[in-house]
Each structure stands twice: as C-alpha cells, then as structure tokens.
C-alpha cells in the first residue's frame, strides 16, 4: 500500500481491508518524501501557479475533461479550491497541462518501482490492475500502473470487475466504491478526468463499439441522442489512436535476431 500526500484515507483503508480479506501479506509505505525529493509536487505546483498565481499551501487541485460528448475537441480544465472553499476553474494550455500530468505521473512510476523491488527480492511477478476500458482507452501511465508481468483483468469491463469483487466476497465498502484516480487532492472521478462518461455507461459504449453496434443502438441503450452516441464512438476511436504508443515496447534501432531468424526470446 503506497499512499502519498494527496491520497484520501479511504483508499488506504480499503486497501487494508482487501489484503486482510484475501489473506495477502503486505507492506505500507508513504511515498510522499520520495516524490518530494524528485520534485513531483514542486513541478506540479509551478504549473498550477502559472494559471492561478495565488495557489499555495492549503489549496487543492484536479484536472477535468470537457468536450467529448458534445462533438467538440476534448480539452482539459484545471480546477482549484482555496482554503476557504472557493472553487475556480480555467482551461489549461498544452504546456501547463503536460507539466502537471508529467509531474503527477511520478506517483504511478514510483509505486511501480517499489512493486518491482519487492517482486525482485521475493522472486515474484508483478500483477497489473488495468481493466478492459482502461487498457483499451489508454488510461494508464506507461512504465507506471500500465507496467506488469501479468494483467489478469485487462479483458474485463469495469462492471465485471465489480461482479468479481462480489464473487470474492470483498467488503461492501470496496464493492460500492466509485472509481477514482486518487491522484489529485480534490475528489475526482475517472469520468471527470478521462472518459467524460460514468464507468457503467462507458462499459456499455465500449462493448457496443467492439460489437459493431450502430450509433442508434447505443443511443437507445444509454437513453441519449444518436448524435451524442456518434460523438462517444468518435472519442473512443480518438483515444485509441492518441494512446497507441503507450502499448508499444521499446523499439530497437536494428533487428535483434537469434537462432532461426527469430527474436532471441523465441529462438
């Protein structure tokens, strides 16, 4: 369990509940000092202050997505909350958006580094967490939460993951928890940051798309207009294209051939 400065306590509590329920040995380590030393929070806050100069101690933040269901290009907004509860939002330019995301991605990558440390010392494999929608739509960090030796739920839609949790008799607090990135200091659902649809509707949309269902069929299933259904399909296609490189392995400049003209691992 690897919380940090912006993690909500409920996530750590649910993690403890799950490992105890399943009888899994675990360690708990706060990675905030590591992130601080790497400059994670400093780089992030510098970019936030470029948009909101007053941002400082006691403020909170998150990034939200807009545009995908209306036919417009997706764009991201920075939302901040002052210590007295006032909320402000502003559309992000590319430079500051990329810096905030790059700094935030330290969190997933530091966690994965620690996972592989323990895997190495115990001679274990690292198990990944992306579900089908996350894997298909590129909602993971390359060499972060997207890195694993085995990905046992990458073929399961989110609703199926919830069903699996109930089959395993995990506590209801876990089974009823809403998906969250738990990455930003303000409460943020995955639909706010990436999908622009609640997870259950996103499951239906991706299943419909993968099954070749018409936009009219998707519109009927979700209770929306055909135009909006087409926007959702277009957004699915766009995310597949723009995140394809997250799935790419490292590419050698020259072919590395082993016996029988096959890559060494297959020779």
Predicted segment positions?
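ATP/NTP-dependent adenylation/nucleotidyl-transfer catalytic domains that generate, transfer
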Residues: 6, 17-34, 38-107, 113-125, ...
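Conserved strand-to-helix beginnings and helix N-cap segments that scaffold or border functional pockets
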Residues: 9-13
């Amino acid at each position: 369990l690897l919380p940090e400065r912006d993690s909500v306590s409920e996530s750590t509590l649910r993690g403890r509940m799950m490992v105890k329920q399943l009888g899994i040995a675990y360690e708990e380590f706060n990675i905030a000092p590591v992130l601080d030393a790497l400059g994670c929070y400093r780089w992030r806050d510098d970019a936030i202050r470029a948009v909101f100069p007053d941002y400082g101690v006691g403020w909170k933040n998150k990034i939200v997505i807009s545009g995908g269901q209306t036919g417009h290009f997706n764009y991201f907004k920075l939302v901040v909350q002052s210590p007295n509860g006032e909320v402000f939002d502003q559309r992000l330019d590319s430079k500051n958006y990329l810096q905030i995301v790059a700094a935030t991605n330290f969190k997933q990558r530091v966690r994965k580094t620690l996972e592989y440390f323990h895997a190495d010392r115990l001679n274990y494999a690292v198990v990944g967490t992306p579900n089908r929608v996350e894997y298909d739509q590129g909602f993971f960090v390359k060499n972060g939460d997207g890195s694993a030796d085995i990905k046992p739920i990458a073929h399961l839609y989110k609703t199926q993951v919830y069903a699996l949790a109930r089959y395993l008799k995990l506590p209801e607090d876990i089974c009823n928890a809403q998906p969250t990135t738990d990455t930003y200091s303000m409460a943020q659902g995955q639909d706010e940051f990436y999908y622009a649809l609640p997870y259950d509707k996103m499951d239906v949309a991706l299943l419909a798309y993968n099954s070749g269902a018409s936009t009219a069929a998707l519109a009927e299933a979700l209770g929306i207009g055909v135009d909006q259904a087409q926007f959702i399909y277009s957004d699915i296609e766009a995310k597949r294209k723009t995140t394809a490189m997250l799935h790419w392995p490292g590419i050698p400049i020259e072919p590395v051939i082993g016996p029988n003209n096959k890559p060494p691992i297959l020779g």
